[in-house]
């Protein structure tokens, strides 16, 4: 029996494993889900043991545990480290899910559940492939280490210290990330760059308590009004960030990615139809849209609060209002510099009568890139090209996968993104799904990849 045949025959069991994994509510940002975090870590550890990883352990990180496993086939063989994460985004808003987020639902060739695409489905694939090699051939063609963290969706605040602490254990020739995404379902792609991240909350306070809007209206400071003015000052008419110093250090984009954008023939009108924008297209060309998504920094408002939120009306002037902000960074930008620029901008524009509080979430991460001449990158392209019948595009990712720069800094090695989710699968949104055809494709691809890397 071949490895490929084993995977085909055991696909039903693999699908049940994925469903069981997705039933675990492993939300990393909310302490209410801490039991789910520990259950998910235990699930991954047990699945590694079942796959034949002789050494499996929980690594203490100072936060949620990371799961580590290894199979050393031969010290003379190259060693690869598979990266993924078992934590997921919060499922809110729950009312927009067609089925409960932690009750996996299979329909129309897709599996719907929170975390199924980001990253439980993709990270399970290399584990299943390793198991197939062990069951069929009794060994792997390469040495394989696995590191699955539990804080990626929280910005990986303890990831860099964990790499430093366990540097010798994690030492490898190359990282293969199961996290990431194909750009589009109809075009094979490999991500060669991703944006960095800086996140913060801002809170504006006026009076010491909520006030009656009749008695105090017109004279008391209203934090919602002040907050709204501050937020609106952070972008220009074209939607680009207008915060002074925000762009400090930013470098020009890689011309090879611009070439990929030109070759993509991206349809901006179709994109806006897909996401449900019906009031006209804010950006008229696919080229400009992708440049903004991939190669320009952003400052987005993720949440806003203040005052009465219940049904009906309440005549109140709230004493506080706030917003959640995340910034995506391009090459050359530093999270510390970006946060400092935003802080200065807000403090300079804060109206009299208000106090401003800024809470930063973690250290953030810098943008990342892959050496375009890396041999493993070319091997990955060859594998996808053979399986899908067309050469994959080298694309950038507007999102953030902070592991690339962290692995380069602390382990001295590069990371290749070899994931089989696609960017349209609604991760971070209601009704997240994973194409089961990609679940199968990923198993074939990882099998080929490990063999090709062993022969390189």
PLM regions and their residue ranges:
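N-terminal helical capping/dimerization or prosegment-like subdomains
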Residues: 1-94, 320, 337
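Active-site metal-coordination/substrate-binding segment of hydrolases
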Residues: 77-148, 441
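An extended, acidic, His-containing surface patch that forms the Zn2+-binding/catalytic region
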Residues: 184-185, 242-320, 328-341, 349, ...
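Acidic, glycine-rich active-site loops and adjacent beta-strand->loop/helix elements
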Residues: 86-88, 147-155, 178-182, 206-208, ...
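Acidic/histidine-rich catalytic neighborhood of metal-dependent amide-processing enzymes
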Residues: 117-193
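Flexible glycine/proline-rich, aromatic-decorated loop/lid segments
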Residues: 189-205, 416-420
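A common structural junction motif
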Residues: 86-87, 234-238, 343-353
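A short core secondary-structure module
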Residues: 161, 217-238
């Amino acid at each position: 029996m071949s490895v490929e045949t084993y995977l085909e025959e055991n696909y039903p069991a693999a699908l049940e494993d994925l469903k069981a994994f997705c039933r675990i509510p492993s939300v990393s940002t909310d302490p209410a889900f801490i039991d789910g975090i520990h259950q998910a870590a235990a699930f991954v550890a047990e699945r590694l043991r079942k796959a034949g990883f002789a050494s499996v352990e929980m690594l203490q990180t100072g936060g949620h545990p990371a799961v580590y496993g290894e199979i050393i086939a031969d010290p003379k063989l190259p060693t690869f480290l598979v990266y993924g994460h078992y934590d997921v985004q919060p499922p809110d808003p729950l009312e927009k899910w067609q089925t409960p987020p932690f009750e996996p639902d299979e329909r129309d060739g897709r599996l719907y559940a929170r975390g199924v695409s980001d990253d439980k489905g993709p990270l399970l694939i290399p584990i299943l492939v390793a198991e197939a090699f062990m069951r069929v051939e009794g060994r792997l063609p390469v040495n394989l280490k696995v590191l699955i963290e539990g804080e990626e969706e929280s910005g990986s605040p303890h990831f860099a210290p964990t790499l430093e602490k366990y540097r010798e254990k994690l030492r490898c020739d190359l990282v293969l990330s199961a996290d990431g995404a194909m750009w589009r379902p109809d075009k094979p792609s490999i991500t060669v760059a991703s944006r960095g991240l800086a996140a913060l909350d801002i809170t504006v306070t006026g009076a010491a308590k909520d006030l009656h809007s009749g008695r105090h209206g017109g004279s008391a400071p209203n934090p919602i009004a002040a907050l709204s003015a501050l937020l609106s000052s952070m972008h220009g008419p074209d939607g680009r960030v207008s915060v002074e110093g925000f762009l400090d250090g930013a470098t020009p984009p890689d011309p090879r990615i611009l070439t990929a954008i030109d070759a993509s023939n991206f349809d901006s009108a179709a994109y806006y139809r897909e996401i449900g924008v019906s009031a006209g297209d804010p950006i008229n060309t696919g080229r400009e849209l992708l440049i903004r998504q991939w190669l320009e920094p952003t400052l987005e408002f993720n949440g806003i609060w203040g005052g009465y939120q219940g049904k009906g009306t309440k005549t109140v002037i709230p004493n506080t209002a706030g917003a959640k902000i995340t910034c995506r960074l391009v090459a050359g930008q530093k999270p510390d510099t970006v946060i400092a620029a935003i802080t200065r901008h807000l403090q300079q524009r804060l109206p009299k009568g208000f106090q401003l509080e800024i809470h930063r979430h973690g250290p953030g991460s810098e943008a990342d890139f892959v050496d375009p001449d890396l041999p493993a990158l070319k091997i990955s392209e060859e594998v996808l090209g053979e399986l899908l019948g067309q050469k994959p595009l080298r694309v950038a990712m507007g999102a953030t996968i902070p592991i690339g720069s962290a692995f380069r800094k602390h382990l001295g090695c590069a990371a290749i993104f070899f994931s089989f989710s696609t960017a349209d699968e609604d991760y971070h949104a209601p009704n997240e799904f994973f194409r089961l055809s990609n679940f199968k494709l990923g198993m074939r691809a990882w099998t080929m990849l490990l063999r090709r890397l062993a022969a390189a």
